[in-house]
Structures are given as C-alpha cells and as structure tokens.
Amino acid sequence: FSDVNGYKFSQDCITNDLIGKMIIYGKNGSGKTNLSKALCDLKETLTMSNDMKSNHSFISNANSNNEITTFTYTFLFNNKKDKVVYEYQKTDLFNLTNEVLNINGKIIYSYDFNKNRFIEKSEDYFHNSDIFSIYQKNTNPSLPFVRWLVNNGAVEKSSVFNKMYEYAVKITQIFTPTTALIQLSRNELDELDRNVNDLEDFLNYMGIECKLSMEKLPDGSKELYFVFKNRKVAFLENASSGTLSLFNFYIRFLMPHKESSILYFDEFDAFFHFELSEKIIQYIKEKYKDSLVIFTTHNTNLMSNKIMRPDTLFILSTSGKLTPLCKATDRELREGHNLGKLYMNGEFDED
C-alpha cells in the first residue's frame, strides 16, 4: 500500500500517501478470495466476529510445511508520529501461539500462549504495573492481549491500542453479490427509512433517475415506493432487474458499512454491466475517501487510467505474487495508454 508512484492523474486512488483504492486481477483459483481472508484476519482475531464463516480450521497454505502462520500489520497513528507493528501467530483460525506489539521500534510486549507468559514486557503506555499479571490470571488460552486491554478499559480511549482495535472492528469483507432479492427485517426497514435519501442518491448516481419514499402501511410495517407525479408505486414490485441488483448491493453492503476502515469487494461486479461497474467504483471512491477499498474482478474494461492508475491496478499470479501493472512491464506507462488492451495483448508479466 505504500508503493505509490508519481502519477498525476486519478489522485483519488491515493489516501494519506498510501494506495487507498485498488483493483486486483487474477485467474480463477489464483487466491483473490484467500487474500481477502488473510488481509482481514485482524478483525477475526481481535473481535472474534467469525465474519469469514469458514468451514475449515486451517489457515496456512496447503502446500506449506509450516504449522504456524504469521500475520503482521503496520499502522501509522497520530499524524504518522506513532508507528505500530502488531504481529501474531496462529495454528488455525482460533488458536494463537504468540502475540507481539511494537511501538516506534520498541517492543511493548511479547506473549507466548503455549507457555502462558510474557517473553518481553514494558510498562510504557500502562498506568497499572500489575496489568500483565492480571491478564495472565484472568484470560482464556487464546484471548489476544490487545482485545483484553480494550474490552476491560485498561487503556485510554485515545491510545494506539484502541485505535488499532477500532480499525479492526471496521474491516469489511464483501463477497460476490447475489441476484436473489433479500428479505428485510423490521430493523433493516427502519434503517432503510433513515437512509432512503441516500439510496435515492445512489440510484440517481447510477443513472436511474427516481424519487423514493418509505410509507407506513395499515399493519404498521413499512414499504419502499417510487414517487411519481400522480401516484406512488411499490418499489420491489415494479423496479427492473438491474435496479433491484443495485438495491441489493446498497442494502447488503453500502448501507450497513458506511464507516469501514477496509472494504474488500470480491468479484463485486459479477452481475453488473461494465459501465455500471465503473460508476460503482467512482461512487465508492467519493463516499469512502478515507477507507482502504480493494476490488477484485475479471473485467478488463476497468483496467483504465480514467478511473484508476498503473500503481493501483494489480495482478495476482497463481504463485501468490501481487504485482502492480507499473512493475509488470518494462514499458513506461502513461495516462494515454489503453491498459486493458495492453493486458489482453500479453504486455504484463503474470508470473
């Protein structure tokens, strides 16, 4: 994310001098979905959210001889004054073996879960010097120290511990949208009622000119309507299939995740025309300016300097190598190049 080139176009893909919006291409089976699980494992570990809902417990590459997998995340907080490196090791989705937190080059703690003891520890950032022994006596065998600190109020709200935890909570994985219409609960209908103007703006942005309203029915339930000059008509019964696909996309993904730190859209445009996919990217770039947003797709029409740039377009090889287009060729890529055409002609190294 820090490997930013000096392109002067599509600056909205860059956030705080980091790549903030990217598209990843790769053959089926290259690992795009697994990449999302690896990147977003921080949320699973710190919040125990089980968002991945995996049906297996292993997390290492199936070809690897290592039983332990290491995850390392680097953050810059407080206007980049504090560099936080958080590292942990796991044998499977649920069991930690080691956890290390480093702030500005100093190890604050290193914990061995197998031995149930701190290998290294520093009292910096903690008001209570007994915090380490309290944790050891009261924790379960695989509860991250960071999570325990935050949930027990052992650190200040403004601390890097809380900031890292809040970042993890807001990580969102979004898998291939479905064309099946979802049934909304009463709470979701209430949420839609509060966001009906935002939904209307979204559809208008996508080129569907309409006015919407939520109406209360005699039985107390709510229903979404198109508003025309002389009457209102039920939205779900009269919207086109394309409009319903966008409605589903908004309801399932955009409405509940307005403040995401990371948004990983896997095969986000599987059911959308490429022009609509382009509009969705533009919309999300505008609405999620401070978020890290990653799209995966097979749509080479989106491989364009019009909406992206060569350092934000990536190829994931079957060997697991992630390479930006600007480093996948010896050619100096310029704004006027047709990147999609170059890709189809075999310009970029995919090994």
Features from the language model and the residues they span:
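C-terminal lobe/lid and adjacent interdomain/linker elements of RecA-like ASCE P-loop ATPase modules
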Residues: 259, 279-351
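Post-Walker A helix-loop "phosphate-sensing" segment adjacent to the P-loop in P-loop NTPases
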Residues: 41-53, 257-258, 287-289
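Short alpha-helix of the ABC ATPase nucleotide-binding domain corresponding to the H-loop/switch region
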Residues: 273-278
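Pre-Walker A-like glycine/lysine-rich segment at the N-terminus of P-loop NTPase domains
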Residues: 1-41
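Conserved ABC ATPase signature
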Residues: 22-24, 220-254, 262, 268-272
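Flexible phosphate/Mg2+-sensing switch loops adjacent to catalytic phosphate-binding sites
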Residues: 45-66, 306
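Short, hydrophobic/aromatic-rich segments at coil-to-beta transitions
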Residues: 65-74, 97
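Electropositive, glycine-dotted interaction segments
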Residues: 85-211
